[in-house]
Structure formats: structure tokens, C-alpha cells
Amino acid sequence: MLYGYQKPLSGEKVGVVFGSFAPLHQGHLDCIMRAKKENDGGCIVIVCGFDGDKGGEMMPLKRRYRYVREFFADDDLVAVYAINDGEIGAKPYPDGWEQWLDEFYKIFEKAVEKNYIDSSDSTLKQYYWPKRHWYAGDVNYVSDLIERGEEATLLDRMADNPICATMIRQNPIKNWDKITFPFRRLFSHNILICGTASEGKSTLTTDLGKYFNAPYSYEYAREYMKDSCVVDWELDGADYMAFLEGQYNLNRKLISSPSNHGIFFADSDSMVTRMYAEYYAKDPTCALTEEEFKQVANMADAITAKCRWDKIFLIAPHGVFVDDHERYMAHSGMKERMELYEILVKNLKESGNWDKVVILNGDYYENFMAIVHYVREVMAR
């Protein structure tokens, strides 16, 4: 694997902790913190695995390596590296130790500084490597390492902190507080509330966020238009691209925020922006051209492919279109709203998200309670 520069550890002795970290959790931190404090040189953390391992598509080895590095980025006593069994040709455990340790020894020489022996003769510089002490939660790993001349300590991680990665993967919300921050974004249950204009989406999203004490995003496009003093028919390709980037970054920031305890509500996303762009590009009174729409559509599709929605509540057109002096009233009729709705349905289907969609046809309170019941079920699993 490729490694960026990390400041080498220095000291007489370093600890070593290795694991798949799918995800990194408090139980792992117990081991790492002990290794860091019991050895003056700190701790080397090795993220292990192979392509298609227990991390699956959600947590492939390269992503786990990145997130573990992110978690320890401000800790000078922890050096994070990774070993991909497939890349080094290591056989499945227990037969792959020789190849695995050969790779580790190469990493070790990058991860630590040599200790030099003071000598009055500057031409005779002598040095030695820091000692190593391994920490593992599997008795077989400890025995194997000792047989190969390494120092190793067996830790009972479940004794003080009864958590394991399997428990988190099976029920992340129940074990949310045990998941380290970089990995939480992967387990967040993300709920999108979408539809055409004036269907109560923004109020619904805000009320749900407050009800569940969960982070929620606003519709970035509306704030952008207020700040830029621009109206719907003036929007061009650059504006729509700004909508796409702004909404994506806003949603991503909230999903990754410390305020997220497992549930996130979004008021809009790239599929909604694409809906408006496609519709307005066909209207000669609007600034957006068909050629610009192609560029917007490509960007929207690329962003949609990067987003993960666990449930999408689609509000069908109903009721009276409210004139808030910001919406484009030329498209306020039921015919126009249904045309927009059909475009959004198409976008949801073509993006592969239709199986996550629940269509809401009730009044505001009925829609609110439908989502509340769903979220309660998710939290009770």
C-alpha cells in the first residue's frame, strides 16, 4: 500500500496493535491507549485486511486505513499503517504470518526512529531499533507472536468495555457511542424528504430534526438565492452547479457532525436540483439552456452516486401552492407540479433509489407521524 509521510515514533520501546477496525471503536481504543502509555515510544497501529473482507463495500480496507489515520491525526504518539494481505501474497490465517511479518518489519523501519549510542568517536555511530511489544485480544495471535520471538500481551477487551465490531455492524444506532467519529458517517441512518415546491418539506424536516434531536439540513438553493438576490428564471448553469455542490457539502457536514447520534434528515439533494434544472431548461423564459442542463445533469448524477440514503420520503403534490414571494408562481399550477413530480420520480428510479422510496399522500400531520413511526422502528431495532 502507499503511505503518506508520518512523523516517526521515538523511544526505547513501542507498542503494536493490529486489527481490521471495521469499524474502529472504544474497545480498540482501550488497547491502543494502553499500548501508547505503557511504551515511551508510543504505539504503531496496523489496519489489516484484504479486498472483500468483513468491511464489505461500506468499509473497504483503504477507507478504514484513511479513517483510522484521521482519528489519530493529532496524536504524535500513534503511527497508523496498513497491510493488505492480498497485495503481499499472505495466505489466510494461520498460514500467512511469515509474509505478514516481513511486511510489518518494513513498516516498522519507517514508523520509528533509530536510537543512537553516544560515542566520543563521531566516526563510530552505533544505533539500535526500539523494542516492540504487541497487544492482542486473541490468545492464538499472542502465542504465534511469542513463538516468533516477539513480546506480546493478551488483553480481554470485552471485560471492561463489552463491545465488538460485529455488534456495531449489526446494530449501529444502539452502539452509537462506541463508534469513533470518522466511522459514524458510514453508519448514520440518512433520511431524505423530497418533493416539489410548497409541499411542506422544509417545515417537516425542521420539525422532525427538533423532535428527534437530530441534525437536519435546510434547502441550500433557497438560501443561495436570497444571498445572491436572484430569482428562479434568472438561474443559469453555474447557479445550479453551486446548488449541487452546496447541498452536498451541507448534508455531508451534518452527517459527520458530533450532533449526529445516528439519524439525519435532509430537506433536499442532487436529485431534486436536477428535477428543477431539467424542467426550467425547457422553459424559454428561464436563463438555463439545454446545453447547460447537460452539464448540470452530469454533475448531479455524479453527486447522487456518492450519496447514501437509507429511506426517502416522497411527498406527492397536493393542496394549495403558497405564494411566499420567493417561488416561481408561473409553475404553481397542479399540472406543472405534476410534471415536476414525474421528473423527480424518474430521477429516483434511474439513480437506483426507488426501492427506498415511501410516497406520502396525507396532510402535514399525517406525513409527520408516518415518518416518526418509521424512525422509532429504526431506533428500536
Give the residues covered by each predicted segment.
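Nucleotidyltransferase catalytic core that binds NTPs
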Residues: 1-189
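The conserved Walker
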Residues: 197
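Conserved glycine(s) of the Walker
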Residues: 200
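Hydrophobic positions on the alpha1 helix immediately C-terminal to the Walker A/P-loop
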Residues: 204, 208
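Conserved substrate/cofactor phosphate-moiety recognition/catalytic segment
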Residues: 210-252
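Hydrophobic anchor at the beta1->P-loop junction of P-loop NTPases
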Residues: 193
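Glycine-rich phosphate-binding loop used to anchor ATP phosphates in small-molecule kinases
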Residues: 242-307
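A glycine- and Lys/Arg-enriched "phosphate-lid" helix/loop adjacent to the NTP-binding pocket
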Residues: 280-351, 358-360
